[in-house]
């Protein structure tokens, strides 16, 4: 990094002496919409349809023009991916995922066994003996016939398990996968269907057993993957109960009405085996735009929450879409992801005026408010860098990223890197109703390393260097040369690799300059 560029970066920074050899910097945070792991806006490329909502997109378009879009989400019926038993069309997924992965973004999936527009279970699997029945969607003879299986049919469980095994061989523990939804149970994977509704009403214990069966199937198949389940599997957040019941919460859209269940046994079980929550979907009802925010807050204590908007075209048609509510919904769910359920151009056009308003509250967002450090240090001297951080997002950073302080030379090359051995960003509380919670971090740092060169005559390489007067290290070796460096901050892995974008100016490769520091012998 050139001196001129560094000067421009530091122009908006307050720096003052704090006694001899100490400096304080108060960086100016920007309002840039960031793209970060473990959070962000999800593009609905396949929405239970092979053609919507991404088929019209240009190849390679990763929607950088929709800032904060970090995930391509693909929800497809099983029949597309296994048209013959044991013959898989992974190329339908991988061809669309490749550009996103190359751009440093993530992928997410839901593979369903029941959808309203076609038979989602492959024909060969039904011929193998899966029991079930056909009915017209929503009992309308004009709608397509759809097949609802017997949800614990042994052949269904066998074939789904085999598919999961093949799917897991490619995607379980894959670092490019953000999450996988449960899709094998109910219409869309949401736990409801004509016969399932009757079972839930007439025999709740049997319905719970079926839920557990399918939750366990996916969990067993993908033990190293973040799994997500729709809140509809528990009936959604609309369930009301008596005010005297234990464990209730108010209903914000029906003041004075019955309160909602605070938790649900099925969701509690899902949490116990590591599932996160997804709301399918918000703003489908003009009077009650959402109902499961209380479930979202429960899950958000430990896992990222996903909210999904209703199909935008339908919401615009019914006049239930209210862009100004996106931020409020994110705040009430403590959401980390939001899925844009519609054609991206229409979604952007409809919501661009509120985009930064909601995107900069989604998930986590780390602001560096203050840095105090010695402006001159000796090589190998133990010093401290004191920094103050605020998470102005609505959710924690669940992966617990690490804090690293770097020294850059005039070319912007990292010459030294020290990662705080204790502090993790999971401990940084999000900004909720009770306001910001700044956290001061004192990072122990040692810049450089000097050591004597052992010379007992047995080192043939050292002897050659001395005899040929070439690359002779002398009596000591210093791994960091004295000089003036740029102190820079980064957030990421505990080995120092930067991964998290910060709202700071002048960053290159997610390493951000803070100030100048001199290293002396």
Protein language model features and the residues they cover:
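Bacterial N-terminal signal peptides that target proteins for export
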Residues: 1-10
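Hydrophobic core
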Residues: 14, 18-19
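N-terminal substrate-binding region of glycoside hydrolase catalytic domains
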Residues: 24-156, 295-331, 335-349
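Conserved, mostly hydrophobic/aromatic
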Residues: 72, 100, 167, 180, ...
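Active-site groove signature of glycoside hydrolases
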Residues: 135-156, 161-201
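Substrate-binding cleft/loops of secretory-pathway carbohydrate-active enzymes
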Residues: 184-217, 221, 228-299
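Substrate-binding cleft of secreted/luminal carbohydrate-active enzymes
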Residues: 248-372
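Extracellular/luminal regions of secreted and cell-surface proteins that mediate adhesion/ECM remodeling
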Residues: 359-521
């Amino acid at each position: 990094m050139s001196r001129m560029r560094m000067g421009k970066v530091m122009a908006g920074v307050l720096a003052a002496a704090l006694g001899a050899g100490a400096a304080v910097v108060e960086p100016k945070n920007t309002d840039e919409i960031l793209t970060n792991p473990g959070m962000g806006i999800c593009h609905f490329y396949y929405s239970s349809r092979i053609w919507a909502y991404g088929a019209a997109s240009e190849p390679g378009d990763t929607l950088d023009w929709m800032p904060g879009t970090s995930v391509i989400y693909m929800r497809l019926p099983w029949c597309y991916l296994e048209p013959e038993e044991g013959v898989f069309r992974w190329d339908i997924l991988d061809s669309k995922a490749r550009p996103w992965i190359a751009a440093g973004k993530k992928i997410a999936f839901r593979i369903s066994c029941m959808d309203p527009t076609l038979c989602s279970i492959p024909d060969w699997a039904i011929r193998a003996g899966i029991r079930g029945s056909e009915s017209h969607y929503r009992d309308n003879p004009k709608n397509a016939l759809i097949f609802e299986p017997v949800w614990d049919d042994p052949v269904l469980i066998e074939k789904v398990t085999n598919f999961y095994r093949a799917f897991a061989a490619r995607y379980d523990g894959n670092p490019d996968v953000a999450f996988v939804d449960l899709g094998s149970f109910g219409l869309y994977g949401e736990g409801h269907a004509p016969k399932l509704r009757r079972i839930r009403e007439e025999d709740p214990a049997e319905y719970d057993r079926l839920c557990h069966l399918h939750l366990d199937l996916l969990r067993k198949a993908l033990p190293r993957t973040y799994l997500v389940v729709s809140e509809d599997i528990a009936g959604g957040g609309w369930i009301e109960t008596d005010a005297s019941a234990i464990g209730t919460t108010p209903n914000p859209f029906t003041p004075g009405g019955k309160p909602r269940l605070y938790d649900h046994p099925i969701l509690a079980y899902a949490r116990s085996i590591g599932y996160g929550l997804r709301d399918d979907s918000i703003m489908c009802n003009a009077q009650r735009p959402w109902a499961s925010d209380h479930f979202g807050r429960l899950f958000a204590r430990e896992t990222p929450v996903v909210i999904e908007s209703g199909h935008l075209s339908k919401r615009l048609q019914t006049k239930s879409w209210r862009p100004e509510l996106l931020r409020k919904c994110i705040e009430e769910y403590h959401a980390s992801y939001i899925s844009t359920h519609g054609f991206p151009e229409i979604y952007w056009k409809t919501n661009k005026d509120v985009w930064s308003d909601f995107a900069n509250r989604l998930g986590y967002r780390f602001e560096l408010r203050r840095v105090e450090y010695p402006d001159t240090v000796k090589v190998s001297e133990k010093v401290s860098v004191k920094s103050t951080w605020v998470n102005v997002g609505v959710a924690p950073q669940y992966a617990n990223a690490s804090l690293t302080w770097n020294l850059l030379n005039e070319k912007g090359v990292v010459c030294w890197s020290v990662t705080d051995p204790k502090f993790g960003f999971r401990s940084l509380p999000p900004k909720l109703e009770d306001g910001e919670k700044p956290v001061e971090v004192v990072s122990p740092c040692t810049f450089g390393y000097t050591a004597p060169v052992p010379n007992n005559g047995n080192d043939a390489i050292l002897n050659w260097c001395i005899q040929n007067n070439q690359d002779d290290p002398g009596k000591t070796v210093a791994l960091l040369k004295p000089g003036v460096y740029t102190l820079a901050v980064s957030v990421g892995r505990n080995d120092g690799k930067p991964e998290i974008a910060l709202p700071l100016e002048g960053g290159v490769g997610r390493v951000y300059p803070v100030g100048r520091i001199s290293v002396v012998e």
